[in-house]
Each structure stands twice: as C-alpha cells, then as structure tokens.
Amino acid sequence: MKKRKTGFLRALALMLIAMFTLSGCKDETSAAMNGLSIENNIAYDYVLSSSLSTAKGFAADLAVSESGSSNTDDGAVSASAALLVDITDGKIVYQKNPHLKLYPASTTKILTGLVALENADLSQVAAIDESIRIDEDNVWICDFRVGDVVTLEQALYGAIVNSGNDAAIIVATTVAGSISSFADMMNERAFELGATNSHFVNPHGLTNEQHYTTAYDLYLIFNEAIKNAEFVKIASTVKYTTSFTRGKYTIVPTWTNGNQFINGSVAAPNGMSVICGKTGYTEAAGYCLVILSESQTTGHRFISIILNAQSRDKLYNQMSYLLEKASYQ
C-alpha cells in the first residue's frame, strides 16, 4: 500500500497553539488517573478540542464535542469516561468526561491496526526480534518467539482478536522497523484525525505515563478505522485459527475474541447489533471497550466507548446501557 505522507503537522500544531495562547484560551493541562497526573509536555498534542475543524483529516460530518462541553451523564455510568455517538447523523447522544485523559490499555490497538493497514502489505513476512520480549508480569501474549515465521496479517489478528501484546510489537517492528518509529506514525496519524489530546509511545497500550488518550479521541480514531473493511473484518472475528512455522515445528493456535458482545458471552440489547470493537484492560486503565453497533430498526450506526470501568461486569453493564440508549434514537 502507498504510505501516507505528513509534513506540515507540527508546524500547524505550533501555529494553532500560539493562536489559542494569544486569545487566552486554555486547555485541560492535566488529568488525574489513578493517582497519577499527566502534564502537557509535548506541544502538538494539546491543541484545544474546539479547534479540531482546523486539523487535517477532520471531516464536517464528525460529531464535535468541544472542550468544556457539558456532560449528558445521568449517573448510570460509573466509569471515568463514556461516549455514545450516532455516526449516521454525526450527533453525540451521551457523553461523560469525553476529554479526560486516561490510559487506553489495548484499545490502543485500534490505532495500531489502522496505521498498519494503511502502510503495509498484510502478506509480508513479519519481523520478530528481541523487542518482542516484555518485562512485565501478567501480560497477555500470543506466545510468538524469535525465529517464528509469521505474516503481518497473522500478527495483526493476534493483536486485535487475541489482544496479544507481543503480536502488537511484531506489527510495529514490521511496519516501521522499531517501536519508537511506529509510535511516531501513530501520533502523526492521530493528529491528522484531530485526536489532539492523545499521545502514544507503544503499539499495545501497556501502561506508560506518556501513553494516553480520551474517549473523544478514541471515537475519532475508531471512526476512521471502521472505514477500512479489513479492519472491520479482523475486529469482528469471533475465532481465528492459523498456522506458522517454528523451526521444524508447525504451530496451530486458535484465538477467540475477548469482546463478549462479539464472542456471544453477552447479548446486545434488543434492536441492536454489535458489529466489531476492541477491549482493553490494565490495572491502571481499568476495563475499557470501544464498540461499533447498528440499530436494527433505523439502520443508524453508533460508536460507543467506556473507559476505566471498575470491573468487567460493570463494563458490559454500562456498555449495554449505552447501546440501549442508542436503540431509542
């Protein structure tokens, strides 16, 4: 695939920041996250959300939630942030703290998938080096190893369907040569989409104080990702079986989608169909979920997001609440 080209992004960001500084506008400079505070250290990531119409790639049909806009929260959602957008009408139906900076956990892999699909051929042989090793306990992996012969497509299914953090690293190093170079691509693409309150340092979403996003930025990123048919195909896959070589052996893993709406563990409310989505969890991020759904009555499509729910049960209960609200639209 032809690689995307960027160049004027940082200059544009600095110009916008200067404009807002002169006019006296203020952005949120930090967000409390489980006792941590994320400060605005990187200039181009902090253009006000109300300036999104000036960012490259910002479309007129996107729902706009300006910084400081009031919540429609009715107390039913206890998660730190939530957002429900009718993407057919470009209308925000429900929002709670849409611009609060939070850890995204594996919802990061939405952007990882988008960048990979836009910049690489899925059939190419993936690059697996020592960077695949993750020095953390209790990290979900596909158990790829140095020397395995896999394609980028297999790694991407491993990253999105199985949420394997090692698979996400393979995607990054295959597409960009290194994790840091891929993170640069992620940040540039996010900025193009108007996701200016986010910053990414890795392709998997494991906790780092400099790796964060907002519910609204995730909406912008996911809204772009679902325009890619291959992304929707991967993110809607219930179960994926593949095979690859490891020395003289053939490895045949089967991965099941952890999204309980996709794998059938949780039923969507009456009148709603869940199409695809991405889960996320770390201790710092809490339970996270991004969903594309459709009303069986009106045909309207919705993006719904929950960030930092306190438990898996609460995550799915609160997401079901958003989907039920969508069914009434």
Task: Briefly describe each language-model feature range.
Residues 2-12:
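Bacterial N-terminal signal peptides that target proteins for export
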Residues 13-14, 25-27:
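Membrane-anchoring helices that localize proteins to membranes
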Residues 15-19:
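Alpha-helical transmembrane segments
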Residues 20-24:
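C-terminal motif of bacterial Sec signal peptides marking the signal peptidase cleavage site
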